């Protein structure tokens, strides 16, 4: 128990000192408690003090993880806390009998709109401003609006003007029907103020304050001062609650050199109810990454698709939208957002991405420390080089090299090689591995370049021994650690060890090795496909052969060298074509075979 609390306490030390909300999770990933804080780190540290209440002690015994969402102000944290508690109803939060929430200002959707306080949202085209945490401030500002702007207060039409008309607080729309333009101007002024444009009104209040002080009417001066403060308070722009009935996901991608942090803010009925963070180590450009992520994320089996997906980068979305809607039977839209509110949401996403990135890097460092112990290394595996071999039935055999630094992909260290030591059709992974390890580390030694701290081979004991024999031949087996990872059982093999190491699924150290292995596998297969595609494309240059037939030639006959060994009759028979076309294929293959080169990197 104490150990898990110590781990949580260390995690809390890394949290930001800004305002925001925090969520405490149980072992089964259930939210136990949601809180807010002006200073997240300081607030959460209090949970680990000796002198805490019995209820808090019971809570902390069940907490296994804490997540934070940063906000732009304490005010926004308060609103977000309210929204999250209503959405998730955690066991350790207060359960209210009603669900009344914070008050808002409503401007009704009518010819002559009314302006009043409400706690209920009605989807009838009305405009809502807020919510406002301090109801007293809201009342003062509404009182100021009612006295300053001549909007209607009475509910029914009348033949005679109302009391407010005689007090100069109403245009008289209760008995006249020809004041639409004038009334519209009054309402627009109110909108202007509620959107935060209050400088002119503040100046007017300041002048009135000076006047009443001159008359020594200090009671009025105090009221005006309080009204001024209230006006400033409620004019603060907040972005946590947007009044609409759509469910909307905002997706922001925070790119760094070797890692992408993908932040998703999920809004439901205009309220932020969930934050989802994903980490991506792929080498996609930002536009490709957004498209790929949205496709994979929203087409997954249990993912609920919102009414709208907002992104902060312009990309082509027509095909993605169509695919999601067809697969999930939805009617979502993907839109590029650059509104004022969207920009503020993006700013909040950036803040949360940076916090998540810091936590991720800390976890990576712990995973590397763990890997160092497991592999019995003398130093941290800061640089890992991973190798894999790919071929097509022994043809176009290639090797890939990927580099990871501090557990993350380092694209400048990626290489691909054509294997020279194998004949076409020869399948020998051990020989291919020996060649690539020899070429790579002979070059590093000759050029006096730094060796990696760890080499990872995609394969089992045989592939490992082949690579290790080359390291011994180069006399660097004591300068670099080498291991292999067998995909089928995810077993780690080390030289001179008879038994492999099996780590639990999800182990952070194993995850690093899997990432390196999978990336080297992807790179090798990608290069192999490229070479095969080039052959296919070249075949399609023959007159009378299209893409489909070119692909069939590759599948049926193999490489240029294979075709070179066949005569026209054999080609015609295998491909079921006439002799004339077979001669064209034979001639083209002979020409290409002469041009074919076997080396990309020496």
Curated annotation (Swiss-Prot):
Subunit structure: Interacts with UvrB in an incision complex.
GO molecular function: DNA binding; excinuclease ABC activity
Domain UVR: 199-234
All copies of domain GIY-YIG, residue ranges: 17-94
Keywords (A to Z) from UniProt: Cytoplasm, DNA damage, DNA excision, DNA repair, Excision nuclease, SOS response
Coiled-coil stretches noted in the UniProt entry, renumbered to this chain: none
SMART domains found in the cross-reference section: GIYc
The keyword DNA repair is annotated on this UniProt entry: yes
Entry GO CC: cytoplasm; excinuclease repair complex
Entry-linked SUPFAM superfamilies: C-terminal UvrC-binding domain of UvrB (SSF46600), GIY-YIG endonuclease (SSF82771), RuvA domain 2-like (SSF47781)
Originating gene: uvrC
Function: The UvrABC repair system catalyzes the recognition and processing of DNA lesions. UvrC both incises the 5' and 3' sides of the lesion. The N-terminal half is responsible for the 3' incision and the C-terminal half is responsible for the 5' incision.
Superkingdom per UniProt: Bacteria
Localisation: Cytoplasm
Signal peptide per UniProt: none
Family (UniProt): Belongs to the UvrC family.
GO biological process, one term: nucleotide-excision repair
Record protein name field: UvrABC system protein C
Organism annotation: Borrelia turicatae (strain 91E135)
Chain ranges passing through the membrane: none
Database matches in Gene3D superfamilies: 5' to 3' exonuclease, C-terminal subdomain, GIY-YIG endonuclease, UvrC, RNAse H endonuclease domain
Family matches, as Pfam families: GIY-YIG, UvrC_RNaseH, UvrC_RNaseH_dom
Record bears the keyword DNA damage: yes
């Amino acid at each position: 128990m104490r150990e898990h609390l110590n781990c949580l306490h260390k995690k809390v030390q890394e949290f930001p000192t800004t305002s925001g909300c925090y969520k405490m999770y149980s072992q089964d990933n259930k939210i136990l408690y949601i809180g807010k804080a002006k200073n997240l780190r300081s607030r959460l540290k209090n949970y680990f003090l000796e002198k805490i209440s019995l209820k808090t002690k019971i809570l902390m015994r069940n907490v296994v993880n804490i997540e934070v969402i940063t906000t732009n102000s304490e005010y926004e944290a308060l609103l977000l806390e309210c929204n999250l508690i209503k959405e998730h109803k955690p066991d350790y939060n207060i359960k209210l009998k009603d669900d009344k929430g914070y008050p808002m200002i409503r401007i009704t959707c009518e010819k002559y709109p009314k302006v009043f306080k409400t706690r209920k949202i009605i989807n009838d085209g009305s405009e809502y401003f807020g919510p406002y945490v301090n109801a007293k401030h809201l009342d003062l500002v509404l009182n100021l609006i009612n006295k300053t702007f001549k909007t209607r207060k009475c509910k029914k039409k009348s033949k005679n003007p109302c009391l407010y008309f005689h007090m100069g607080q109403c245009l008289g729309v209760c008995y006249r029907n020809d004041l639409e333009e004038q009334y519209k101007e009054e309402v627009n002024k109110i909108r202007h103020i509620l959107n935060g444009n209050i400088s002119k009104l503040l100046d007017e209040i300041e002048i009135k304050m000076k006047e009443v002080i001159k008359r020594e009417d200090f009671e009025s001066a105090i009221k005006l001062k309080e009204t001024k403060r209230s006006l400033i308070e409620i004019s603060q722009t907040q972005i946590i609650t947007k009044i609409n009935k759509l469910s909307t996901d905002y997706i922001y991608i925070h790119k760094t050199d070797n890692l992408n942090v993908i932040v998703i803010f999920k809004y439901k009925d205009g309220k932020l109810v969930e934050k989802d963070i994903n980490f991506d180590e792929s080498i996609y450009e930002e536009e490709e990454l957004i498209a790929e992520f949205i496709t994979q994320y929203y087409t997954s089996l249990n993912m609920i698709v919102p009414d709208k997906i907002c992104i902060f980068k312009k990309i082509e979305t027509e095909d993605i939208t169509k695919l999601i809607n067809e697969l999930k039977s939805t009617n979502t839209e993907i839109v590029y957002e650059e509104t004022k509110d969207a920009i503020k949401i993006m700013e909040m996403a950036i803040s949360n991405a940076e916090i998540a990135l810091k936590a991720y890097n800390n976890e990576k460092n712990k995973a590397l420390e763990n890997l160092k112990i497991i592999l019995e290394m003398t130093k941290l595996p800061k640089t890992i080089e991973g190798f894999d071999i790919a071929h097509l039935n022994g043809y176009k055999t290639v090797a890939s090299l990927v580099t990871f630094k501090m557990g993350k992909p380092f694209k400048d260290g990626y290489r691909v090689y054509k294997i020279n030591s194998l004949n076409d059709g020869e399948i020998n992974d051990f020989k291919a591995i020996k060649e690539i390890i020899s070429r790579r580390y002979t070059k590093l030694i000759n050029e006096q370049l730094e060796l990696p701290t760890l080499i990872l081979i995609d394969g089992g004991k045989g592939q490992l021994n082949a690579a290790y024999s080359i390291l011994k031949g180069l006399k660097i087996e004591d300068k670099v650690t080498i291991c292999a990872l067998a995909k089928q059982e995810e077993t780690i093999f080390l030289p001179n060890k008879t038994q492999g190491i099996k780590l639990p699924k999800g182990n952070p150290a194993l995850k690093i090795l899997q990432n390196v292995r999978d990336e080297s596998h992807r790179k090798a297969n990608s290069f192999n496909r490229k070479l095969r595609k080039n052959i296919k494309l070249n075949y399609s240059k023959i007159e009378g052969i299209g893409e489909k037939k070119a692909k069939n030639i590759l599948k049926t006959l193999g490489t240029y060298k294979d075709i070179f060994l066949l005569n026209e009759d054999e080609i015609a028979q295998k491909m079921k074509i006439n002799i004339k076309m077979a001669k064209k294929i034979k001639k083209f293959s002979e020409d290409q075979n002469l041009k074919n080169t076997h080396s990309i990197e020496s």
